[in-house]
């Protein structure tokens, strides 16, 4: 896997500053620090979303050697994943440099600098049965510390039943065992070295 890239040094246009003043408040930043998640609606323009969608189409047409299918052969759909392509797919490179996401990350982390660790494409085709299991992102990465942000950006309408969910405050720890999505294997840490995730689905009221 490529090493994390250097901080993007391209000056951010003034129009991004204006957009963030309208979309990201001090209360939002405090809420993100408390809950570990924040929904920012209409942050991206239709043209920016279209650019990302074009990049995903290019990625599907020519997957990298890191790509994998996270659904079983008998699944009527397909769950496709690929990583670390922003330097190889022009649309991804433009999306990273020409949208306000770096500034959003900087403000939410309350950091002076921002480094891009990787891009991660996930595509579930219609009819896919494979669910994305509950998990923490942090233990999958080769980094420590609290200044780490994942941004989930849907390019198609997503129903409430299929949308991303979070357990508020779970980012504050403890770290829980990361496992492969399809076969539940522990590949990042030795088995038993971290606590396993609780069964969130069995007791949703306990995990708001």
Regions found by a protein language model. Name each.
Residues 2-35, 41-134, 139-142:
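Non-heme Fe(II)-dependent double-stranded beta-helix
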Residues 120, 136, 153-157, 166-168:
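Short, structured patches in soluble enzyme cores that scaffold and shape functional sites
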Residues 37-39, 150-154, 206:
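Conserved hydrophobic/aromatic beta-strand scaffold that supports enzyme active sites
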């Amino acid at each position: 896997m490529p090493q994390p890239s250097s901080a993007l040094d391209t000056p951010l246009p003034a129009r991004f500053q204006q957009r963030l003043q309208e979309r990201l408040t001090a209360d939002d930043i405090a809420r993100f620090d408390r809950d570990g998640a924040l929904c920012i609606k209409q942050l991206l323009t239709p043209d920016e979303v279209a650019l990302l969608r074009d990049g995903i189409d290019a990625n599907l047409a020519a997957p990298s050697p890191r790509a994998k299918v996270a659904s079983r052969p008998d699944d009527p759909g397909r769950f496709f994943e690929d990583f670390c392509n922003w330097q190889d797919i022009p649309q991804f490179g433009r999306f990273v440099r020409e949208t306000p996401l770096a500034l959003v990350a900087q403000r939410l982390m309350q950091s002076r600098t921002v480094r891009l660790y990787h891009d991660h494409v996930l595509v579930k085709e219609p009819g896919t049965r494979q669910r994305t299991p509950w998990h923490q992102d942090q233990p999958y990465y080769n980094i420590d510390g609290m200044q780490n942000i994942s941004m989930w950006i849907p390019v198609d309408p997503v129903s409430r039943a299929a949308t991303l969910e979070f357990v508020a405050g779970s980012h504050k720890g403890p770290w829980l065992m990361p496992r492969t999505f399809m076969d539940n294997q522990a590949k990042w840490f030795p088995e038993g070295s971290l606590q396993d995730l609780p069964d969130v689905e069995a007791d949703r009221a306990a995990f708001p």
